[in-house]
Amino acid sequence: MKFEDRILNKSIPEWKFYNINYEKLKVAIKKVTAYDYDNPNDSGMEKLLNQCSVAFDQEFQNVNLFVSLKIKEISTRILSVESSIIDFSKGLNKTSRNRFNLRKLKIINAHVDDCNFELQLLSRFLIIQRIALRKLFKKLLNEFPQDSENPLTASEYVTSIRNSESLRNGHEGISFMKLDLDPYLLEVSLIVDVLHDLENKLEDATEPAVEQRSLNRSDESAHTSSSPEANNSSLPASPRSIPLLSNKKTSKMIDSSLEFDTALIDKAENLGRFLLSSEDIEGLKFMLLNIGFRIIDDSIISTSKEILDTTDNINSAGNKSIRSAKSFNDLQHTLSLSKQKNILPSAVQSNEKYVSISILDTVGNEGSPLLLTDDNINQHPNMIVSSTAEDTCIVMCHVGGLRNHVVTNDLLLRDVKNILSAMRSGNDTKNISALINSLDPSPISKIALEWIQSHRLKTIEPKLDFKRTRFISADNGDIYLIALDESITIGNVSTLPFPILEIKKLSRSSGLSQTAINEDNKFKQLMKSVVTNEFQCSLIPPDLTTWKICLELVHSNELQNDLFQLLLRDQYKLNSDDSLSPDEFFQLGKDRLEEEFDLTGPINNSQGSVDSGRRVRIHKKSKQSDNETKKKPIRYWNEFDEQEEDNLDNAFYIDTNGSRSTTDNEESLLLRNSPPDYGFILFSRNFINRTYDFCEKLRNLIRHDKKTSPDLFQNSKHPHCSSTNYGSVASFGSQSTSASYDDVQRYLQYQQQDIEDSQSIYEYRHDEVVTFLYLSALLTSCIMASVCLGIVLSLFRGQSNNEIDLEIQNILIAIIIISLLVSLILICACLLLLFSRFTLAPIWHYVGCFTMFFSVTGTVCYGMIEIFF
């Protein structure tokens, strides 16, 4: 498919007429590149270049005009929402119904969602325009003619277009190439935080009101219960994409960037790590806001709290100073003019705060850190996480053992640097210990500092610096953390060309298996949103953490190609000289993402065949070769196998997902995954077991079977019980015999239960129950058809139809018709049940069932003919 058609397919349908006219610019470029110097009829080269520049300039002006108007429209709506929040905050202290206030919040939240959705569409629109322009520039650079009559080079001409007034400054200072939507993202996130805090404030105000209402007189309470205020327990969830959080406990567990980063590297379970295309960063951020995630930013959190704290001051300031406030910024300016305390901060600044990671290792491991060879250390290495804007830091030490690692965030960065500097200077151990004790650290912090001291750890190169955007969402008691790391710089030398998206979960249950991760509803919703919005991303293997990727690529000369080789080495066979383009790499990532999480992306023919346009042939590694390289589980002398010798390679463990051992959930899942039932009629396992037990009880009742054979252990127990024992030794022996008997009985019960739960026993019971059902249906159908046939013959053949005079003739005919139809349904169900067995039935079952089927069918047809004709 042509590139211009791909632009139309990817663009927003309502805005497709505002896209860059790719076809028009391509024709202008083609005239320049196809210039024939030998043809005197062709126009001059300079004229063609001017025409091409004018065409570019016109398209830039059109796109810039639309973007300028759209961003101003969104800004106006955001200011209107902020003004509504200010008015709402001013009226909170007045007497008003909480249900009415919550409804107002819901309406404001709907407008916020509209603004966020418009920003997401605008982000997608800008990405499409930038891709189209980059494609056009690439075409110019590759096909630009060079001749003595045209001394201008391709790069110079493209640079002149890039530096044009319409592209640099845009329309009224807004250019689609330079427009940054991050400030709008922070502003929307601030509004969402204020709405959450206002909702929590309303809920807190409702609780004492309910207590006071319970102390009122009975007539007043009766009147109150009938009023709308009594039914304000909760409003239905907002149908919009940005929900109002009602769970205050989960939303306040992590309320700072420091706590977020601590939880991210400490107790959070990894759900997935992805390499994201740089073009989809802004769109992904707005999409996360749409599906209920909130941004964790210290400036936003502090601003939200201070806005709520100013409610009383706003009310006391008078209408004169508040009347003209149209936004949070105007409100702060108005309050400063009235010489009040500077209680509201200025606009939420998008000042770039970078996160730094310094890896700690022992002396001599600078060239090959331990985390490159040990995956346990790789997941929780010795490192220091700090921020450029704060003096606090996070220290993590891999101590091993049951604790595995310790993490602390109550140390100052300068104190940790002083200790590391003292160790490098060769200070005495006692002096360093005294320095540690002088800090008065917490127990965990002291363990971390003493670990650094005892193992003589020091910072190694390279140092990692990156910009981090944090998102959080609470769902069913679980907290989901998303970290988007951009501009990852490796030792101030090189920068990763793509950001890394990391998704983790603070779960109530630890140790998530891969099956549990893939079945996580929130994570699955997130992955579906990524595929639906056509974001380009690729799943990173779990063993490749951000710091390991950077350490692997620290000496790379071709960073992008080596990064692709590193991420694909476990799934695909690539030669060292193979070079993938970003589109090819992310297409492979999309295929794996859909396969890994059982997702189906939108049908997009614009992508074309992946293999058809690929410059490098890629062969996927077979899973069999991967399984062969895995180590077999270690067997010990006291392990016994009760399975067949050829089952699971004589392994004691049930080895699933390539792990050394399995959890109880995985074993139960493996046992539940029985061979599928392909019968015509399917039954639940519970129904089969209950029906079989009922049939057994009925059979025993008919045969008058009784349990006449006592247990072997019960017979052997009576002689010991009948004999008289004296003394403590005899008494102890009697008690131990009784205890061992109970243990054996319980063991036999468990063993019997395991046997009954096995697949072979279930198949046997299934066939027995199905046999009982189809034989019963066969017998019932034959009896009903025979009785109906006798009645029909006696009524319609015994005498003439005109002589039949019965008062209940119509009722009798209806009963006969219904009985014939029921017998036909039963005989059909009999055949379906016959072919629903796991094993083949005896041959006489098939002969008898088919014979009776044709007989009953003929009887039904004959009866219907006699009745109606």
UniProtKB/Swiss-Prot annotation:
Topology Vacuolar: residue spans: 793-810
Membrane topology: Multi-pass membrane protein
Compartments it resides in: Vacuole membrane
Modified residues (Phosphoserine): 238, 241, 316, 324, 327, 609, 612, 668, 760
Cytoplasmic side: 1-771, 832-848
Main location class: membrane
General function of this protein: Regulatory subunit of the vacuolar transporter chaperone (VTC) complex. The VTC complex acts as a vacuolar polyphosphate polymerase that catalyzes the synthesis of inorganic polyphosphate (polyP) via transfer of phosphate from ATP to a growing polyP chain, releasing ADP. VTC exposes its catalytic domain VTC4 to the cytosol, where the growing polyP chain winds through a tunnel-shaped pocket, integrating cytoplasmic polymer synthesis with polyP membrane translocation.
Subunit text: The VTC core complex is an integral membrane heterooligomer composed of the catalytic subunit VTC4 and the accessory subunits VTC1, VTC2 and VTC3. The complex exists in 2 different sub-complexes: VTC1-VTC2-VCT4 and VCT1-VTC3-VTC4. The VCT1-VTC3-VTC4 subcomplex is mostly found on the vacuolar membrane. The VTC1-VTC2-VCT4 subcomplex is observed in the cell periphery, probably ER and nuclear envelope, but localizes to the vacuole under phosphate starvation. Each subunit contains 3 transmembrane helices. VTC1 is a small membrane protein without hydrophilic domain.
The protein's name in its UniProt record: Vacuole transporter chaperone complex subunit 5
Annotated source species: Saccharomyces cerevisiae (strain ATCC 204508 / S288c) (Baker's yeast)
Source organism phylogeny: Eukaryota, Fungi, Dikarya, Ascomycota, Saccharomycotina
